[in-house]
Amino acid sequence: MAAIKDENNDHLVQSDNPEHPSNLIPALCRNFYSHGWVTGTGGGASIKRDNHIFIAPSGVQKELIQPHDIFVLQYPTPKYPPSARQYIRKPLELKPSACTPLFLAAFDRGAGCCIHTHSQWAVLVTLLVEREKGPEGCFEISNIEQIKGIPRGKGKGMLGFFDTLKIPIIENTAFEEDLTSSLEEAMEKYPDTYAVLVRRHGIYVWGDDVAKAKTQCESLDYLFQLAVEMHKLGLPWVKS
């Protein structure tokens, strides 16, 4: 049994440290489930530590994930084809996350953690933006205190109360991995963004580390919910 474990590099996901990625990912997923962000096996999370990428599996109840369920990739690794990705630790009978190439796109930009949720508020704002601005519109909001929880850009500090937060929106596809090119195009068009919305689907949020990715995700979800409620009251998202 020990030889099998060594062969599968199980030691990579075994740690008593609560800050180890294999322990953080299950904890994050339980937290996200309580918010309704990863309902019905949706969503995911990934953490980069040194030259390893730790990823939650696909198609499982995220609130039940355990450390031994975590995949580990060698980084850097090719996004495509999936067979070229260098997994150095694979749980038996579980599928790698379909979000993997999108997570890798965030890590290629220097992220330390990337989160994908199916937040209902995120989905709703993508529909409202489409109706009000058309398919090319992005989500914008200003003069809300919680905006201060979002970075202005890499190394540029945080947004201020009077700044306008802009989050690009891309169209959904039948298969998760097919979102990668659109996500990367949005990253190029909005180089200071730390999130990309996916219409009728959810959002990808990344940060320099786990804490920043988590708090940015929370701040954005707060802003999306607020935006939906503001829309009901006929209040503009961007103050004139």
Swiss-Prot record:
Disulfide bond residue pairs: none
Compartments (UniProt record): Cytoplasm
Binding site for Zn(2+): H116, H118, H201
GO molecular function, one term: zinc ion binding
SMART domains associated with the record: Aldolase_II
Catalytic activity entry: 5-(methylsulfanyl)-D-ribulose 1-phosphate = 5-methylsulfanyl-2,3-dioxopentyl phosphate + H2O
A GO CC term attached to the entry: cytoplasm
Enzyme Commission code(s) on record: 4.2.1.109
Signal peptide: none
Keywords tagged on the record: Amino-acid biosynthesis, Cytoplasm, Lyase, Metal-binding, Methionine biosynthesis, Zinc
Entry annotation: catalytic residues: E145 (proton donor/acceptor)
Pfam family of the protein (one): Aldolase_II
Cofactor: Zn(2+)
Protein name: Methylthioribulose-1-phosphate dehydratase
Source taxonomy: Eukaryota, Fungi, Dikarya, Ascomycota, Pezizomycotina
